[in-house]
């Protein structure tokens, strides 16, 4: 029997027996494929011993599926992403479908009714919204369910883009009150910008569009929907961008090639993901290159950034803290 799992993570594929030993779940039988939207979760399944094939893609794999099992709920993913994936499952026409819903029965029934009430309707869940920095052109950006801040501009990302665009455009030296060395932008032809955790490309595209000099833009995200959106936006905007799907930063051959790093790292997991961001920034930047990150409160991120860059300047914007460091 061919089974497709949707919304499952590696921990869902194991159980603990009476002796306290972890083993593959007893219900894992037959030819099973587990779909992931995020390459991190895909790699976790690949590196486990559960015997399940893993596939990572922005959309569900087509095939003659005997069974599709979908795990979702308000704490697991957004309602719009749940509905989007449920519609994709419906269009696969599996022989059998099972929903594992982590939430209230009322919410479960409401989700299913949106497909059952109009089964032939195919909805487009993408959206297009405007974004700009002061003095810059307005960009129309597309995003999909699963992208960070789908349907709206993230204020933290916008604060980061505004600070970086302003500083690069003005080619300013650092504030005289800081011990950081001046950053001579006049020598940069073109600007080499790395946008990590790019999402649909908000920060990278706004910064690139604000510059008069040519820009080499590399964008990285672990989520396939984000990569899909960033590639689409690069094509629409006519911005030459290399968009990478990765959960471990940039490849070694890119080390020491960037002038500017921008990142809006997630705050959860005790800043472990921020460690990956900043380790990548330290590797990827040229000597004299500048790292910009953003967070709501600098108290948590600043100590992490100082492990990789001894000097950190904090710039306040839109109620957020933009942390700025220079690679020695």
Where are these regions (language model features)?
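SAM-dependent Rossmann-like transferase core, predominantly class I methyltransferases
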Residues: 109-171
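C-terminal catalytic and target-recognition region of SAM-dependent MTase-like enzymes
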Residues: 284, 291-328
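Short "lid" loop at the C-terminus of a central beta-strand within the Rossmann-like core
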Residues: 103-104, 267-268, 296-300
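Conserved proline-anchored active-site loop of SAM-dependent methyltransferases
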Residues: 67-79, 196-204, 258-270
